[in-house]
Amino acid sequence: MSEGEPKNTHFGYKTVEADKKADLVADVFHSVAAKYDIMNDVMSFGVHRFWKRHTIEVAAARPGMKVLDLAGGTGDLTAKFSHLVGDRGQVVLADINDSMLKVGRTKLRDKGIVNNVSYVQANAEALPFPDNHFDIITIAFGLRNVTDKDAALRSMQRVLKPGGKLLVLEFSTPKHELMRKVYDMYSFKVLPKMGALITKDADSYEYLAESIRMHPDQETLKQMMVDAGFEQVDYTNMTDGVVALHRGYKF
């Protein structure tokens, strides 16, 4: 690529100019925001709740801590963290998509979760928070939609306190060939049809399936976290590696 030419990236399987991907991803989540929680339950058969519960357990949030739930969407993790950090703590639900934030804010307020939660529309690649600010950062099913994942990881490392931890919960690469074949069939044949039926939007769920395949595998993401400055990076596979939880610390 010669100097001055636009940089390209992937949007699912499509190649697009890097500076246009965020808008394309935004369109997807504007479209699915209202039915996002329903689709999570349907397309994962409810298993996403187990994945998130395990993430909360590994996070080990305590009273008084500051937690950033990045790409927090409709607030599943934020709701749990709010109870754990208590009145002396703080949870920031941050998402680049205002439609998702609105759904999350309404959902949490309907549950009476108001006192220790704030909402910020933010780009993960340039987080608008001070250095060394959060004890815990989580990003669940969001990193694969970020244009510059390396920049986002560096930004998270910057705003994390020394001694703090980052948890990345994301779809990944199944360990066994049979699971990979079943998963591919489900993702590309069944998932878009579910999206069409429930949200009237098959294309968005086709993108989501493609974005999973384009996301770095477990070992690649582990190295990306190390390169961003995280230490003691490890990961746990769940559901045969359909999902992986990566953990890294800042010292």
UniProtKB/Swiss-Prot annotation:
Keyword match Transferase: yes
Give the reaction(s) catalysed: a 2-demethylmenaquinol + S-adenosyl-L-methionine = a menaquinol + S-adenosyl-L-homocysteine + H(+); a 2-methoxy-6-(all-trans-polyprenyl)benzene-1,4-diol + S-adenosyl-L-methionine = a 5-methoxy-2-methyl-3-(all-trans-polyprenyl)benzene-1,4-diol + S-adenosyl-L-homocysteine + H(+)
Classification via SUPFAM superfamilies: S-adenosyl-L-methionine-dependent methyltransferases
Q: Which UniProt keywords apply?
A: Menaquinone biosynthesis, Methyltransferase, S-adenosyl-L-methionine, Transferase, Ubiquinone biosynthesis
The record lists S-adenosyl-L-methionine as bound by 74, 95, 123-124
One Pfam family, please name it: Ubie_methyltran
List the EC numbers from the record.
2.1.1.163, 2.1.1.201
Question: GO:BP terms for this protein?
Answer: aerobic respiration; menaquinone biosynthetic process; methylation
Q: Which family does it belong to?
A: Belongs to the class I-like SAM-binding methyltransferase superfamily. MenG/UbiE family.
Protein name according to UniProt: Ubiquinone/menaquinone biosynthesis C-methyltransferase UbiE
Species of origin reads Shewanella frigidimarina (strain NCIMB 400)
* Lineage, highest ranks first: Bacteria, Pseudomonadati, Pseudomonadota, Gammaproteobacteria, Alteromonadales
Name of the coding gene: ubiE
